């Protein structure tokens, strides 16, 4: 249809300019416009040769991206605290969460606990690890129902909170497992809401990219959601201070291949958020 329209339009030019000159001119116009019409498609096809493709899969991305040797499940909690209650809330968590963490009867560990410094204000973030996966989580939840100290904590906590939410996460196989580290450090939690169906592609690129971001031991952990907000990725980083963060992030651009990772992963993101967090006294990640 587009070619017929072009012929129709150009025939008018042909009649106006004369048979000899118009015919050649109309043909040139048709060829020029046809080439312009097809060029974006050709360019797109040409560029597609260099875009990393993800092979079709017949398995859940949780099986393809998570660590096979460990059966760890993570829970991240976001608690928005009444401003006037933040100090009391922190003290309450310092006592009770530490007791759960150190009690061998509970197959769980407190990976880290923080207050958000930049991002949502008056917010606490807790990251737990359950060694043994969902059965370990179920066991912990069952035992906590009979833990008097925890029940009192939960009652007091309810008076201090404005809202709360959580997610269950798995860790990417190409990230190191988060382990306690000495401080003082600040932590950045970068959260990405991906477009549905792009988690495998994200994992493919970041499996290569993580090598560019470990020179200052800044990489702490990488996770993707299983329950809660889906297609959500969390990357946790540690820095000495904000200037160290700036310098470390800028240095990544000096490594060949980092720019390509950014170029191809940005279109996979629907929304992203950065939190700068300060560890609490009882946090294993100092």
UniProtKB/Swiss-Prot annotation:
Q: Name one GO biological process term.
A: mitophagy
Cellular component terms (Gene Ontology)? cytoplasm; mitochondrial matrix; mitochondrion
Which GO-annotated molecular functions does the record name? protein-macromolecule adaptor activity
Q: What is its main location?
A: mitochondrion
Q: Which positions form the organelle transit peptide?
A: 1-40
Q: Which InterPro entries match?
A: Dimeric_a/b-barrel (IPR011008), NIPSNAP (IPR012577), NipSnap_domain (IPR051557)
Question: Entry's Pfam families?
Answer: NIPSNAP
Question: Where is this chain's protein located in or outside the cell?
Answer: Mitochondrion matrix
Question: Is Oxidoreductase there in the keyword field?
Answer: no
PANTHER family, A to Z? NIPSNAP-RELATED (PTHR21017), PROTEIN NIPSNAP HOMOLOG 2 (PTHR21017:SF14)
Family stated for the protein in its record: Belongs to the NipSnap family.
Q: Describe the task this protein carries out.
A: Protein involved in mitophagy. Accumulates on the mitochondria surface in response to mitochondrial depolarization and acts as a 'eat me' signal by recruiting proteins involved in selective autophagy.
Name of the protein: Protein NipSnap homolog 2
Q: What is the lineage of its organism?
A: Eukaryota, Metazoa, Chordata, Craniata, Vertebrata
Its gene name is: nipsnap2
């Amino acid at each position: 249809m587009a070619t017929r329209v072009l012929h129709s339009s150009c025939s008018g030019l042909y009649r106006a300019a004369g048979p000899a000159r118009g015919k050649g001119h109309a043909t040139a116009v048709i060829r020029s416009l046809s080439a312009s019409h097809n060029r974006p498609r050709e360019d797109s096809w040409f560029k597609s040769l260099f875009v990393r493709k993800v092979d079709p899969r017949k398995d859940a991305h949780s099986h393809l991206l998570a660590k096979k040797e460990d059966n760890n499940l993570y829970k991240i909690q976001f608690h928005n605290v009444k401003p006037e209650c933040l100090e009391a809330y922190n003290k309450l968590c310092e006592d009770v969460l530490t007791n759960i963490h150190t009690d061998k009867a509970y197959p769980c560990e407190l990976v880290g606990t923080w207050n958000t410094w930049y991002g949502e204000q008056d917010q606490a973030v807790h990251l737990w690890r359950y060694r043994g996966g969902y059965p370990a989580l179920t066991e912990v939840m069952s035992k906590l129902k009979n833990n008097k100290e925890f029940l009192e904590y939960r009652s007091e906590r309810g008076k201090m909170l404005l809202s709360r939410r959580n997610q269950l996460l798995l860790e990417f196989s190409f990230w190191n497992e988060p382990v306690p580290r000495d401080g003082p450090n600040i932590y950045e939690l970068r959260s990405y809401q991906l477009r549905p169906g792009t988690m495998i592609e994200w994992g493919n690129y970041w499996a290569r990219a993580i090598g560019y971001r470990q020179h200052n031991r800044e990489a702490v952990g990488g996770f993707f959601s299983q329950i809660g907000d889906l297609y959500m990725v969390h990357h946790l980083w540690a820095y000495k201070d904000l200037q160290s963060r700036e310098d470390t992030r800028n240095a990544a651009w000096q490594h060949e291949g980092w720019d390509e990772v950014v170029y191809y992963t940005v279109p996979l993101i629907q929304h992203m958020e950065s939190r700068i967090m300060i560890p609490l006294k009882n946090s294993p990640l100092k």
